[in-house]
Amino acid sequence: MPSRNILVINCGSSSIKFALVNEAHSLFPLHGLAERLGSRDAVLRWKRGGDSDSLMIPNADHRAALAQLLPMVQNAAGGKLHGIGHRVVHGGELFTHATRLDGRVIEAIRATAPLAPLHNPANLQGIEAAMTLFPGLPHVAVFDTAFHQSLPEHAYRYALPEALYREHGVRRYGFHGTSHRYVSHRAAEMAGLAVGDSSWLSAHLGNGSSTCAIVNGQSLDTSMGLTPLEGLVMGTRSGDVDPNLHSHLARTLGWSLERIDSMLNNESGLLGLSNLSNDMRTLEQEREQGHPGAALAIEVFCYRLAKSLAAMSCALPQLDGVIFTGGIGENSPLVRAKTVAHLRLFDLRLDQEANARCVRGVAGPIQATGHPRVLVIPTNEERQIALDTLALLD
């Protein structure tokens, strides 16, 4: 049987990330980004093989951008497209696995929008546009939260009145599940272990970051919570702060809830600490030039990351290794070294040459000889979404 092609779509409020995934090949035949949708500057950019190109699509919405994309996808797939996988950020407690999309599922995703007001409505825009343009193809939703539905109750419940959970779904959900699942499977493969008999601490580090405790292929704890704001220091998100900060700022500065939410999500994290940038690459360069804010932001980021990994270890029966992934995790030897240095009680130590070598897509072990595994594994959420989609077509 010839190998199958899946189009993977990830829709933001004004963007669409897309990748054509062939089950038999590691490289994407076609991938790209439509951005600034709804504006005069809307543009579609793509790469096919070694070639890059772009097309201005003024005022295009999600449907118009996907319509422009359709002939490119069909051409790159040789006329054989077998399904479409959609990334959906929040599935609440309703979805524990990838799910074939139909009217009932779409309404259930819509019902979870209050849990992810910035993400789920945008995801739905893409789903509805794609289902209109590709009516004859199977469509599958893959949820960021689904992998974490295996968390035990003592890990996902907040110490709040029970009615808030029972009536309003206030609990920890976790995110980046597709990435954590993908890299934990790759880690077991690299280590020669069975997925069902392995335990990992995973750190997905990018503009959004989270840690995860993974035992026998299941998530048992994770750092993000009800929303992606909980947990680690991130690019522009604060991560954990005193829960009373909202009332303190409202009382002393007169800030509204909207102003506080915007500050915590868009003005904090690495950007807030450094007063410079949310980009770790920029901060590392400025740190070398003696910028105190950049140095502080990196120190806080790594210390908080190490604290979270240590906390996640409570869910593990043994430690088979620590995984670094995501844009920062895959490309910052400095962050990996500083984080591991804080975890000396775990007897972790890095091989400096191996750590320096694992950047720009290079995977591998970076631990010193005789010490517990530390692995750098490039994530591939698009391939995992495609595999989940294919599994429902079999």
From Swiss-Prot:
Catalysed reaction, written as an equation: acetate + ATP = acetyl phosphate + ADP
The answer, when asked if Nucleotide-binding is one of the entry's keywords, is yes
Site (Transition state stabilizer) at H176, R237
Q: Which domain of life is it from?
A: Bacteria
Please name the GO terms that the record assigns under molecular function.
Answer: acetate kinase activity; ATP binding; magnesium ion binding
Q: What SUPFAM superfamilies does this protein's entry cite?
A: Actin-like ATPase domain
- Pathway info: Metabolic intermediate biosynthesis; acetyl-CoA biosynthesis; acetyl-CoA from acetate: step 1/2
What is the uppermost EC class here?
A: transferase
The family database entries (CDD domains) matched by this protein are listed as: ASKHA_NBD_AcK_PK
Question: Which InterPro entries does the UniProt entry name for this protein?
Answer: Ac/propionate_kinase, Aliphatic_acid_kin_short-chain, Aliphatic_acid_kinase_CS, ATPase_NBD
Which keywords belong to this entry? ATP-binding, Cytoplasm, Kinase, Magnesium, Metal-binding, Nucleotide-binding, Transferase
List residues binding substrate: R87
Protein residues bound to ATP: K17, H204, L205, G206, N207, G208, D279, M280, R281, G327, I328, G329, E330, N331
Its cellular-component GO annotations read:
cytosol
Q: Which residues bind Mg(2+)?
A: N10, E381
Q: What does this protein do?
A: Catalyzes the formation of acetyl phosphate from acetate and ATP. Can also catalyze the reverse reaction.
Q: Which family does it belong to?
A: Belongs to the acetokinase family.
What's this protein's name? Acetate kinase
Lineage runs:
Bacteria, Pseudomonadati, Pseudomonadota, Gammaproteobacteria, Pseudomonadales
